[in-house]
């Protein structure tokens, strides 16, 4: 296969709302050629899609709101499509696979005192197409995550994380219309950090 080609144009701005809280904004357009995709007419075959673009806007916010409250979040709007018909399945005007129009995430950590902190986060992804033929749609989903932090002493911290708190069933990704991966069920892990 020929190598992929791309041209990216981007403009952005950053704002220090206060010394430890920053926001950023970026607008972009990415034009790509020779992009390898699975041919839905013959899933054992890879074809090159020569002509697609993505344009979008990204907003990010990260830092401390107060001494006890930290947050990190972002939102993205993306639009992308095939700009030239390549095959019976990769048709001009089709939306790109795996590209949600809207996605957002927000993570909050609040330190109750110097020993204990809690975290809560949300992840949202709008629906996406499994492939460039736009025949199979993976539905939108919203997932909640949580954490508890304990400072045992200045050098030792314990952390419990729970991902997919509500045990939401969702589809995370797809390699083709018939190779779709589910999102992970509720999972938890413990982490011990030692600083020396």
What are the roles of these predicted feature ranges?
Residues 1-24, 29-32, 37-64, 96-102, ...:
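Outer-membrane beta-barrel signature, preferentially recognizing the C-terminal barrel domain
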Residues 9, 95-196:
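Conserved C-terminal beta-signal and adjacent last beta-strands/turns
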Residues 35-43, 78, 82-90, 129-136, ...:
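Outer-membrane beta-barrel translocator domains and adjoining extracellular loop/strand segments
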Residues 19, 67, 154:
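Structured loop/turn residues at beta-strand edges in well-structured enzyme cores
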Residues 42-48, 60-62, 85, 91, ...:
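Short flexible/disordered coil segments
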Residues 24, 29, 48-132, 166, ...:
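Gram-negative outer-membrane beta-barrel transporters
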